[in-house]
């Protein structure tokens, strides 16, 4: 353990601001003397004790609960003391200062914790693995109920157990191949007898299932960015308001009302969609409007999906069609390959006999009225399909981009391993190396093989006191 990880640490563990309860947390080795100094008595482990909190002069700071968790049966795996007082910021700062003051003659190395350091201690002391540690932050940051439930499953170890199952199968296959390397005269019969090819195929199928569930979990965590674009007065702000179920953007019949982006995160079946309303796209002499249009194109360039809004009531105008075609051409040039564009034909209520016109190259289209809500459910289903959401089935766990990247690396190494195994006269040393690299990639998910730099990035994103 690095030197800083042996220091006792203290921090306010509750969120900034006022609340009914606030917590000051201390973690370290052999903090019993500090517990005695702060509480005026020894505490019975894992039981709440109601008592006064006093400063060094014996003056009352507050009264509340103290809980002592001796190592190793604590959150961090070290001795942990929690002081639960009233949740005013001044009270908590006084308690924090009292902890540091009382430690001067007892725990002179006691210091303020860095962000995420309590959870980092839990990881380093084998209380949780890295995927579970990340799930704590994901649970705190969850923006939807589905994301919170998925993070809870990861925290309880569902994702980690899947990874361990894959790793165990991989280790068994590695043992088989590497043992064969020690007895080259028997290599072909030995591999066939043990059905190494069948084991590898089963492993690849299991990996595919984990990747599918992980990708769904990553979607719950990250969501997708959806940009609404189109000519002025096509109904972009009305569509944002309709999707959000609230009057977020100003709606007027005056073209060019929206000068800057308006963003709102909505959820459909628990999937967060970051929807952005943008300025109407057109040529303009107004400097402020031109800035808004430039920002609109910047947002479009970074979109995961674009809703290209058309006004059905103006589609009979040749000029309107030409302007729409010019926007479509610019979209095709500016958007990265593979970013879907949904043609949304708005104001269907004002043109009840109209059907969605067919545009050249159009692959997806929705006919709707942002004012009445007609067609909104169809658009929502279309957005879920674009996002890649398959169902709201139980069992999805939260995964991060780095987890997906690691699983893809495992898949690539297993593909190479399969190619070696299926070739005439397989190169067993190359096969063994691919399996080793696959295992290393798996281990980075749970933290069994992870660089200190990555740990620093992960835990620094936590709040102080967690």
From Swiss-Prot:
Its EC number is 3.6.-.-. One of its GO terms (cellular component) is cytosol. The keyword GTP-binding applies. Keywords: Cytoplasm, GTP-binding, Hydrolase, Magnesium, Metal-binding, Nucleotide-binding, Potassium, tRNA processing. Its cofactor is K(+). Residues 223-388 form the TrmE-type G domain. It is found in: Cytoplasm. Signal peptide: none annotated. K(+) binds at residues 233, 252, 254, 257. Mg(2+) binds at residues 237, 258. Its main location: cytoplasm. (6S)-5-formyl-5,6,7,8-tetrahydrofolate binds at residues 25, 82, 127, 466. InterPro entries: G_TrmE, GTP-bd, GTP-bd_TrmE_N, GTPase_MnmE, MnmE_dom2, MnmE_helical, P-loop_NTPase, Small_GTP-bd. The keyword Transmembrane helix does not apply. Binds 1 potassium ion per subunit. GO terms for molecular function: GTP binding; GTPase activity; metal ion binding. GO terms for biological process: tRNA methylation; tRNA wobble uridine modification. It comes from the Bacteria. GTP binds at residues 233-238, 252-258, 277-280, 346-349, 369-371. Belongs to the TRAFAC class TrmE-Era-EngA-EngB-Septin-like GTPase superfamily. TrmE GTPase family. Homodimer. Heterotetramer of two MnmE and two MnmG subunits. Exhibits a very high intrinsic GTPase hydrolysis rate. Involved in the addition of a carboxymethylaminomethyl (cmnm) group at the wobble position (U34) of certain tRNAs, forming tRNA-cmnm(5)s(2)U34. This is tRNA modification GTPase MnmE. The lineage of its organism: Bacteria, Pseudomonadati, Pseudomonadota, Betaproteobacteria, Burkholderiales. The gene is mnmE.
């Amino acid at each position: 353990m690095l030197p800083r990880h042996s220091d006792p640490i203290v921090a306010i563990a509750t969120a900034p601001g006022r609340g009914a309860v606030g917590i000051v947390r201390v973690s370290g080795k052999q903090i019993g003397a500090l517990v005695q100094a702060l509480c005026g008595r020894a505490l019975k482990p894992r039981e709440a004790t109601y008592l006064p909190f006093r400063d060094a002069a014996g003056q009352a700071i507050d009264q509340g609960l103290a809980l002592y968790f001796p190592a190793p049966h604590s959150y961090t795996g070290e001795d942990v003391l929690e002081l639960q007082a009233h949740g005013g910021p001044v009270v908590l700062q006084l308690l924090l200062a009292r902890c540091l003051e009382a430690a001067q003659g007892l725990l002179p190395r006691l210091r303020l914790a860095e962000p995420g350091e309590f959870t980092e201690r839990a990881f380093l002391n084998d209380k949780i693995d890295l995927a579970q540690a990340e799930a704590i932050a994901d649970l705190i940051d969850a923006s939807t109920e589905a994301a919170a439930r998925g993070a809870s499953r990861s925290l309880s170890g569902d994702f980690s157990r899947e990874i361990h199952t894959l790793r165990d199968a991989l280790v068994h296959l590695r043992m088989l191949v590497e043992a064969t390397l020690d007895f080259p005269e028997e290599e072909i019969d030995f591999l066939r007898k043990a059905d190494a090819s069948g084991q590898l195929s089963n492993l690849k199928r299991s990996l595919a299932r984990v990747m599918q569930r992980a990708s769904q979990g990553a979607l719950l965590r990250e969501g997708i960015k959806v940009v609404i674009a189109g000519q002025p007065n096509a109904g972009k702000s009305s569509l944002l308001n309709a999707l959000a179920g609230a009057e977020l953007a100003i709606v007027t019949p005056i073209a060019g009302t929206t000068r800057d982006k308006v963003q709102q995160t909505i959820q459909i079946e628990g999937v967060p969609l970051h929807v952005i309303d943008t300025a109407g796209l057109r040529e303009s002499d107004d400097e402020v409007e031109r800035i808004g249009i430039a920002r609109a194109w910047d947002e479009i360039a970074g979109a995961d999906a674009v809703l290209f809004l058309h006004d059905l009531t103006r589609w009979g105008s040749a000029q309107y069609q030409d302007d729409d075609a010019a926007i479509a051409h610019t979209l095709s040039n500016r958007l990265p390959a593979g970013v879907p564009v949904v043609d949304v034909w708005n104001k269907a209520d004002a043109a009840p006999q109209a059907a969605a016109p067919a545009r050249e190259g159009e692959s997806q289209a929705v006919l709707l009225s942002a004012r009445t809500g007609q067609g909104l459910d169809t658009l929502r289903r279309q957005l879920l399909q674009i996002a890649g959401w398959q169902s709201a089935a139980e069992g999805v766990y939260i995964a991060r981009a780095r987890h997906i990247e690691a699983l893809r690396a495992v898949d690539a190494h297993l593909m190479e391993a399969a190619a070696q195994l299926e070739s005439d006269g397989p190169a067993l040393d190359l096969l063994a190396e691919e399996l080793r690299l696959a295992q290393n990639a798996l281990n980075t998910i749970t933290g069994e093989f992870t660089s200190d730099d990555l740990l620093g990035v992960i835990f620094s994103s936590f709040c102080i006191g967690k």
